């Protein structure tokens, strides 16, 4: 129970090595880290509220396939979410996925095995801590060039991707 809470909230604490576990459990926990912490927390991942809105929007689209003229607002609690909020969550999800894929391809191109690269990028982008494979305890076997890519992933995960993307827009730097 402790491990699942620690990893899904991206706290990074472990009480035992994953090497002793059946392989599907650590992989399941790593995928849970994509959900991450709650909104407003410093936890990594997509955040629970964003995943919830993505789920509700997917459910709405399935209902629209059955009933094309259905007006189906997405609500969090009793509050109806504006379509712009939903679009911004999809934009964040797309940017998150893009950063993940670019970092994964970057680490693989540095000569890291695919399984280890996948786990290293998950651990860094989600600010997770533990991972699987050769990066389960430390990153000493990872080439320095891959560590630079993983550093970028870690910064993107910690500071939120949109916060970093804003720095690269010209309007941010105008007075």
Residue ranges, per PLM feature:
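Membrane-proximal intracellular helices of multi-pass ion channels
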Residues: 1-175
